[in-house]
Amino acid sequence: MKMQIQGETLQISEFAELGAANSNDFRDKARAALTAAQKNIEIDLSQTMFMDSCGLGTLISLHKTTCSRNGAVKLVNPTPNVRQVLDLTRMHRLFEIVNR
């Protein structure tokens, strides 16, 4: 998993799955990387082939964290499998999902 800071945004990329095996670690690392200056998180899902309910829970947890800072979580380039999970669970109503 790669993280970098761009202005008010923490950008996260390069991870193959977000599920029960790694979701707590993912959430903890993302929260630890946020400083007082970052209020947004942008998650690049272009290499993520698998996401389960634990992964969705992690995204919702990060959403709550950013909302408390008046920010948001943006999901970028989800793979077809991940996009299907997001659509079936109606997460597109909660998150901005962008294809670049």
Predicted regions and their residues:
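Short, glycine-/small-residue-enriched flexible loop/hinge segments at domain edges that mediate gating
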Residues: 31-52, 76
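Aromatic/hydrophobic pocket-lining residues that form π-stacking "cages" and hydrophobic walls in ligand
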Residues: 29, 59-62
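STAS-typified acidic loop motif
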Residues: 2-28
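Absolute protein N-terminus
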Residues: 1-2, 100
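Conserved beta-strand core positions
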Residues: 10, 41, 71-73
